[in-house]
């Protein structure tokens, strides 16, 4: 749309002074030759990369640097969107670009374009700042939008490679094959090619068509209309897409820039100016002045126009003044705040939606409506009641949703037309479409206070007295207010000034006769005005040549008189429009320039003709030719105003966007932003509609006000932006909060207390919806102050809302401070319902304070008031609150009775979303009571009913509560793995719809565990899928520990699924993630758990050594985690024993035994020495094994405390007996050990073990070893450890 690129940059507004004569050079002027190779290369097909990188960074305005936490949050959000990029694609589709990929690590998007229109629109949105604002919509959540200070301080800055963007633009331009260029220099074709090649002047505009690659192109001059070949080296494509679009869609001729014209950096001016040189007029309508004379500027003087309207301060005469004859530094330039339009014109743009102001205000009051003064609140219910679902009645008509349409209508070029008196059919059709289909002259009864009653009977044309009234009426010298209706394009003069004609032809005949009498009577002004009226009526009948004659006659009659400037302007502009329609530019080139000056230089002038757009287009073409941004801006504004008045909204957008780029400074840009938001809303572009109002809001922070109709527009469009389900009754997006705050500030300036209060209530509703009661309390406190100023009812309602917000913020004491005085202020004669409402809220506050008895009394009083007025709903709420109070007080039986009664009362009510959501909460409480009373079937039924009601209304939060309860029921109360998985899956779906990424990650983790517990091939595969999805989310959320554990879980699952090649990969990723987080305890834990994967498995168990010995042990030593190190050495010992690596096992067991003596835990020491004894035994080091076993026995308590200790004694002494007898060949010591084992077995009461030991003793006594050594003589062996040695 009407935009420019950062690159190509706008060149100097003067592209070379003056119109140059053709060069004597037979080809081109010398200044073009140097760059001919480059220019030819630009027009040749090139293999360019069609993708563009869009980078962004989040910056703090106050600190002027990157906001690190927000930048990281935005990057993580982008990472989450990489695999689910539908939302991003839709955003860039609105921004007229195509998403190729997302590069979250670099905070970049890769986009591409297929047409020049796409790159034009995108570059426009980029330069208007809409791309960065739309990225805010995408990347920031409600927490950001609710933080007003953060929003005001934060901006997203986007950047692209401007040169690459220009390259893509030129490539697409050439690909389309038809575009417009500017002549870089004067060109005269050689004699042999005369007639075949074009003769060009410098800066001349040419329409070019690409046929095939070569040094010459076919072109048509927009100045002469001639067709021919032109050298590529002499041309430069117009760098601005808006200019290409405009020249293609509004075809027509244009002039050349003149040598003595000044444009440059000059602004539109007004006031007085000084003549550089004197001027002798060539026409009667031009002003005569001398050098140095002071000239008063009537309206504006605009750089790029040949003329402006001036008044001589010496003679008082008014006429056209050639712009080049005045000193551009002598006039007063327009301020930056109104660079191209007057204050009245700016207000006309701002008033675009003002007719909807009352309706929009009504909508805000409806949105703010609450039933808190008549409806009881349920304990735990999270928001102030919302207004009714059907808001269509209060929805302003002009802001209904519309289906997406085209950005603008494509206009087809009109073919060449004959300039004869009879117009061709295509011209007639075009003009007929611009005029009304039929017209009925009104009867006298239709009119209010007509100016004239005209009547012309047959045969009265010759009687002068019959025309005296109209001639006297029209022959006023200069302008009068009653002539205003003559010049508007609605032909209102037919109803406001004349009547009594039933047919238009009859009226035309009367005017024609009047013209003749005016001419005879030399009544100049009446004659001119009658010609003007006849010309306008001829245009209505598409008789352009006839109209042209009338207008030319009127101008001739005026003879340069400017007393009625409105008449002069309307005559010139209408005649110029006809010249352009009939292709008669050669006949009226001077008049075209003067008509353009009257059109552009006179502010606040009402449009007089629908085909005035042709003159506006001519002025805009001239602005493009001379490179005058002020003239281009002024022409764009005129096009906007005219098209809006004609209701052709689709055609306005390109001009409005271009004008916004050219304006740049408020309040002019503010006025155009207002138009843009209106148009984007019409075209169903919600991102852009909100972004344009945000732009307005930024300016509003600098002192501008935000209209209420734009707030309504934002409220409508923000609900379309977010991917949540369609918002229910009264829900407002947090994205609207900044604009609501701006509107609130504007209402404070206007002292509009009623709307202020409505906005405060809406803002509080948003904060409560997002569980930010502190923000709600802030705005409700304001609403209370405003309510007290507005009236008792508003004050009462605001007080209740504030008390409810305090309750939701768990500030029961403050709620009591509001409610108790409110109750005292109510008279006994006041509404019973209002007293009941206060008692109910008092009950909630007292319950929050833990004052159960007083809370119960308040609830009962509220119940009594509801019963007195017969309000079943309020009775149900009071019963439910009593039940909840009883439940919290562990009074199960009363709780059950109250809640059952509440359910019965709710069932009597007519079903609605509000009551059903309350019933969900009651069912959950009742289920809790029933389950705690072991009525599991009935409790389950209540849980399922709660879920059913939530599903019925598609209410996510109630479904979430019910689903949580069902998951707990099937996991802990009545375990059922399959049902538990089913409800966890539904819980996951709800989390995804709510976009709660943290909840989604936790649920995927839980689901992975549940599927893993089923231990089937299919469940393991599903578990792996869940773990991988949770991993992606944890990385997105920056939860390093969770991400590392997810990697570990994935490795564990790959091991169970025997996908060994992926196990090490996942385990290493888990450890690296932990190490990068610089959390050594997490890394230590993961090293150990990674080793456990192999240690607890059946395959590749030796891989555990690497994770234990090389990873966990060094970290444990560095962290001085002695117990962890001991546990790992114990695992290493056990692992090596199972692998029969006894030498290694001895090393690890020895280290474990040493560490165990440091811990001070005898049990750990006992385990370590027992393992060491086992290793020595396996290595056939029996004496050391005996010593270690004896050491373990010395660590046991002296008195047996349990059968387990007795069993341990029996087994160890039995092992020592066998070891001593069989390996050490000491029968006497073996006997002692067996006797001790027998004693332990007797204490244990194990008859079988006793028999085995007695059998062993008998065998020893009968063995040769028993007799080979004297009785009582034991062999001498090492007893270092068991003898009290302190070190191994």
Curated annotation (Swiss-Prot):
Report the outcome of residue 1217 to D. In CMT4C; uncertain significance
Annotated ranges, domain SH3: 176-240, 268-331
Please list where the region (Disordered) is annotated: 386-405, 410-444
Q: Which GO terms describe its cellular component?
A: cytoplasmic vesicle; plasma membrane
User: So which domain of life are we looking at?
Assistant: Eukaryota
Annotated TPR repeats reside at 528-561, 757-790, 836-869, 1001-1037, 1084-1118, 1119-1152, 1166-1199, 1210-1244
InterPro entries attached here?
SH3-like_dom_sf (IPR036028), SH3_domain (IPR001452), SH3TC1/SH3TC2 (IPR042772), TPR-like_helical_dom_sf (IPR011990), TPR_rpt (IPR019734)
Q: Which UniProt keywords apply?
A: Charcot-Marie-Tooth disease, Disease variant, Neurodegeneration, Neuropathy, Repeat, SH3 domain, TPR repeat
Biological process annotations from GO: peripheral nervous system myelin maintenance; regulation of ERBB signaling pathway; regulation of intracellular protein transport
- Bias (Polar residues) occurs at 386-395
The cysteines joined by S-S bonds are none
Q: In which tissues is it expressed?
A: Strongly expressed in brain and spinal cord. Expressed at equal level in spinal cord and sciatic nerve. Weakly expressed in striated muscle.
As annotated, the protein's associated disorder is: Charcot-Marie-Tooth disease, demyelinating, type 4C: A recessive demyelinating form of Charcot-Marie-Tooth disease, a disorder of the peripheral nervous system, characterized by progressive weakness and atrophy, initially of the peroneal muscles and later of the distal muscles of the arms. Charcot-Marie-Tooth disease is classified in two main groups on the basis of electrophysiologic properties and histopathology: primary peripheral demyelinating neuropathies (designated CMT1 when they are dominantly inherited) and primary peripheral axonal neuropathies (CMT2).
Q: Per its record, how is this protein called by name?
A: SH3 domain and tetratricopeptide repeat-containing protein 2
Q: In which organism is this protein found?
A: Homo sapiens (Human)
């Amino acid at each position: 749309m009407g935009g420019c690129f950062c690159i190509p940059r706008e060149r100097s507004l003067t592209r070379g002074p003056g119109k140059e004569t053709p060069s004597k050079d037979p080809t081109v002027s010398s200044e073009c030759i140097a760059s001919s190779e480059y220019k030819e290369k630009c027009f040749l097909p090139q293999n360019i990369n069609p993708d563009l990188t869009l980078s962004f960074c989040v910056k703090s305005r106050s600190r002027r640097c990157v906001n690190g936490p927000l930048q990281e949050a935005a990057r993580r959000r982008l990472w989450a969107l990489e695999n689910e990029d539908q939302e991003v694609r839709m955003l860039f589709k609105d921004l007229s670009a195509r998403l190729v990929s997302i590069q979250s690590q670099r905070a970049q998007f890769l986009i591409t374009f297929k047409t020049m229109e796409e790159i034009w629109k995108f570059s426009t949105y980029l330069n208007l700042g809409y791309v960065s604002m739309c990225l805010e919509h995408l990347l920031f959540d409600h927490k950001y939008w609710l933080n007003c200070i953060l929003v005001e301080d934060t901006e997203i800055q986007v950047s692209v490679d401007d040169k690459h963007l220009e390259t893509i633009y030129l490539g697409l331009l050439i690909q389309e094959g038809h575009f417009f260029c500017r002549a870089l220099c004067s060109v005269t074709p050689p004699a042999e090619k005369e007639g075949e090649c074009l003769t060009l002047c410098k800066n001349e505009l040419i329409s070019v068509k690409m046929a095939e690659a070569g040094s010459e192109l076919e072109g048509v001059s927009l100045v002469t209309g001639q067709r021919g070949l032109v050298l590529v080296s002499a041309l430069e494509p117009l760098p601005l897409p808006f200019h290409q679009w405009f020249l293609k869609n509004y075809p027509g001729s244009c002039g050349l820039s003149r040598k003595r014209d000044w444009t440059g950096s000059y602004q539109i001016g007004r006031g007085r100016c000084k003549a550089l040189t004197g001027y002798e007029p060539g026409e009667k309508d031009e002003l005569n002045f001398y050098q140095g004379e002071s000239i008063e500027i009537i309206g504006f003087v605009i750089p790029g126009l040949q003329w402006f309207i001036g008044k001589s301060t010496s003679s008082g005469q008014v006429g056209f003044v050639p712009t080049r004859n005045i000193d551009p530094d002598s006039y007063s330039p327009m301020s930056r705040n109104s660079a191209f339009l007057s204050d009245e014109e700016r207000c006309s743009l701002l008033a675009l939606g003002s007719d909807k102001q009352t309706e929009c205000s009504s909508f805000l009051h409806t949105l703010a409506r609450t039933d808190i003064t008549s409806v009881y609140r349920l304990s735990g219910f999270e928001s102030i009641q919302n207004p009714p679902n059907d808001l269509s009645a209060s929805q302003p008509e002009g802001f209904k949703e519309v289906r997406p349409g085209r950005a603008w209508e494509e206009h087809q070029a009109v073919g060449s037309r004959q300039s004869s008196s009879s117009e061709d059919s295509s011209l007639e059709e075009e003009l007929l479409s611009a005029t009304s289909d039929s017209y009925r002259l009104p009867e006298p009864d239709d009119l209010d206070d007509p100016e004239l009653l005209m009547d012309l009977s047959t045969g009265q044309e010759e009687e002068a007295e019959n025309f005296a009234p109209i001639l006297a009426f029209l022959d006023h010298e200069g302008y009068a207010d009653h002539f205003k209706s003559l010049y508007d394009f609605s032909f209102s003069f037919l109803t406001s000034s004349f009547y009594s004609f039933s047919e238009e032809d009859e009226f035309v005949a009367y005017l024609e006769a009047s013209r003749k009498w005016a001419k005879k009577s030399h009544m100049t002004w009446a004659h001119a005005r009658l010609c003007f009226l006849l010309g306008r009526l001829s245009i209505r009948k598409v008789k352009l040549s006839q109209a042209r004659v009338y207008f030319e006659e009127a101008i001739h009659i005026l003879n340069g008189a400017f007393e009625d400037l409105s008449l002069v302007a309307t005559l010139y502009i209408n005649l110029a429009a006809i010249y352009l329609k009939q292709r008669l530019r050669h006949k009226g080139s001077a008049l075209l320039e003067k008509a353009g000056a009257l059109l552009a230089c006179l502010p606040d002038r009402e449009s007089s003709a629908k085909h005035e757009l042709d003159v506006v287009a001519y002025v805009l073409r001239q602005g493009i030719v001379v490179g005058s941004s002020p003239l281009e801006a002024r022409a764009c504004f005129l096009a906007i105003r005219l098209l809006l008045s004609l209701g052709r909204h689709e055609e306005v957008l390109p001009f409005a966007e271009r004008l916004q780029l050219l304006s740049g400074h408020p309040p002019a840009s503010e006025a155009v932003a207002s138009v843009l938001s209106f148009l984007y809303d019409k075209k169903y572009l919600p991102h852009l509609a909100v972004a344009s109002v945000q732009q307005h809001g930024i300016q509003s922070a600098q002192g501008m006000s935000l209209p209420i109709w734009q707030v309504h527009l934002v409220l409508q469009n923000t609900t379309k932006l977010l991917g949540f389900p369609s918002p229910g009754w009264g829900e407002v997006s947090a994205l609207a909060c900044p604009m609501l705050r701006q509107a609130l500030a504007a209402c404070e300036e206007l002292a509009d207390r009623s709307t202020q209060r409505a906005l405060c209530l809406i803002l509080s509703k948003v904060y409560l919806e997002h569980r930010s009661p502190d923000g709600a309390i802030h705005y409700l406190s304001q609403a209370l102050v405003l309510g007290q100023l507005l009236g008792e009812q508003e004050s009462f309602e605001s007080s209740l809302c504030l008390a409810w917000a305090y309750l939701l913020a768990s500030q029961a004491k403050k709620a009591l401070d509001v409610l108790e005085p409110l109750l005292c202020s109510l008279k006994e004669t006041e509404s019973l319902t209002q007293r009941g409402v206060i008692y109910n809220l008092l009950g909630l506050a007292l319950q929050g304070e833990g004052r159960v008895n007083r809370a119960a009394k308040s609830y009962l009083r509220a119940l009594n008031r509801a019963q007195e007025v017969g309000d079943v709903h309020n009775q149900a709420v009071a019963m439910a609150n009593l039940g909840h109070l009883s439940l919290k007080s562990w009074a199960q039986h009363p709780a059950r009775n109250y809640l059952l009664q509440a359910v019965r009362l709710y069932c009597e009510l007519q079903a609605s979303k509000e009551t059903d959501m309350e019933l969900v909460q009651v069912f959950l409480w009742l289920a809790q009571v029933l389950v705690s009373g072991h009525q599991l079937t009935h409790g389950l039924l209540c849980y399922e009913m709660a879920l059913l009601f939530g599903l019925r209304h598609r209410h996510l939060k109630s479904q979430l509560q019910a689903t949580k309860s069902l998951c707990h029921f099937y996991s802990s109360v009545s375990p059922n793995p399959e049902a538990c998985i089913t409800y966890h899956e539904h819980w996951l779906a709800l989390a995804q719809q709510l976009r709660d990424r943290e909840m989604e990650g936790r649920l995927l983790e839980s689901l992975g565990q549940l599927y893993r517990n089923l231990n089937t091939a299919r469940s393991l595969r599903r578990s792996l899928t869940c773990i991988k999805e949770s991993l992606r989310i944890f990385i997105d959320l920056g939860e390093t520990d969770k991400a590392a554990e997810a990697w570990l879980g994935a490795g564990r699952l790959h091991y169970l699924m025997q996908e060994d090649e992926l196990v090490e990969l996942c385990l290493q990723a888990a450890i690296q993630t932990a190490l990068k987080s610089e959390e050594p305890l997490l890394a230590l834990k993961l090293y150990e758990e990674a080793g456990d994967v192999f240690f607890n498995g059946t395959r590749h168990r030796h891989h555990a050594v690497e994770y234990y010995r090389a990873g966990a042990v060094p970290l444990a030593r560095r962290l001085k985690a002695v117990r962890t190190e001991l546990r790992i050495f114990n695992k290493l010992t056990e692992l090596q024993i199972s692998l029969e690596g006894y030498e290694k096992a001895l090393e690890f067991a020895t280290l474990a035994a040493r560490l165990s003596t440091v811990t001070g835990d005898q049990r750990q020491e006992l385990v370590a020495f027992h393992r060491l004894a086992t290793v020595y035994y396996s290595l056939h080091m029996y004496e050391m094994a005996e010593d270690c076993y004896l050491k373990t026995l010395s660590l046991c308590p002296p008195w047996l405390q349990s059968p387990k200790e007795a069993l341990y004694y029996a087994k160890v002494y039995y092992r020592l007996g066998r070891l001593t007898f069989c390996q050490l060949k000491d029968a006497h010591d073996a006997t002692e050990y067996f006797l001790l084992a027998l004693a332990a077995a007797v204490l244990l009461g194990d008859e079988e073990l006793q028999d085995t030991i007695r059998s062993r003793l008998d065998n020893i006594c009968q063995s040769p070893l028993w007799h080979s050594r004297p009785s009582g003589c034991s062999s001498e062996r090492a007893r270092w450890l068991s003898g009290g040695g302190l070190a191994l």
